[in-house]
Amino acid sequence: GLPVCGESCFGGTCNTPGCSCTWPVCTRD
């Protein structure tokens, strides 16, 4: 739901729990 997780995912993975990679940033549901 929230657009930003405060993390980028140029490598394709997110370290923040509950976040997924919508390149090039991590997004939350």
Curated annotation (Swiss-Prot):
InterPro entries: Cyclotide, Cyclotide_moebius_CS, Cyclotide_sf
Function, in words: Probably participates in a plant defense mechanism.
Record bears the keyword Disulfide bond: yes
Entry comment, domain topic: The presence of a 'disulfide through disulfide knot' structurally defines this protein as a knottin.
UniProt modification remark: This is a cyclic peptide.
Single Gene Ontology BP annotation: defense response
Keyword Signal annotated: no
Linked residues for Cyclopeptide (Gly-Asp): G1-D29
Similarity comment: family membership: Belongs to the cyclotide family. Moebius subfamily.
Protein name: Cyclotide psyleio D
Keywords carried by this UniProt record: Disulfide bond, Knottin, Plant defense
Disulfide cysteine pairs (residue numbers): C5-C19, C9-C21, C14-C26
